Amino acid sequence: MQNKQNLIWIDLEMTGLDPDTDVIIEMATIITDSELNTLAEGPVIAVHQSDETLAKMDEWNTRQHGGSGLTQRVRESTISMADAEAQTLAFIKLWVPERSSPICGNSICQDRRFLYRHMPALENYFHYRNLDVSTLKELAARWAPELKFKKGSTHLALDDIRESIAELRFYREHFIKP
């Protein structure tokens, strides 16, 4: 059910860091309420890319996405970039009115750059503001360095979103004073 207080969490995995030369290979979304309770998990989508495109990945991406099985899932996927955008939009429209939720995640500006370049309708659905958990991570590192949130490193989109939500809960409990 749509609620303008719900939050849209998104994570992308890409072939690299440059939205002009690299592409999205996986995406996932989660909807939470304003208290960070998960309401729904959206589709986890491996976006098909050609072997030629995948061969252009640098060593880190080749090793990471190959080791996690993502590269193989991308090769086997039949879902195009446009289909992935449409599926994700259909999901979030069930939960959040247009332009009411900031884009939520970790280092979310990078994801937003890729959405702007490759999935403009989806990028435009978000409010112009960002809810970037990495901002709190940077502030905590400087103002409360004893606070450490331990993250995994699967670099799979759904796992990364779950960790981002857990990390924001951690900072809410231990860093943000009521």
UniProtKB/Swiss-Prot annotation:
3'-to-5' exoribonuclease specific for small oligoribonucleotides. The gene is orn. It is found in: Cytoplasm. One of its GO terms (cellular component) is cytoplasm. Its main location: cytoplasm. The keyword Cytoplasm applies. Transmembrane segments: none annotated. It comes from Pseudomonas syringae pv. tomato (strain ATCC BAA-871 / DC3000). This is Oligoribonuclease.
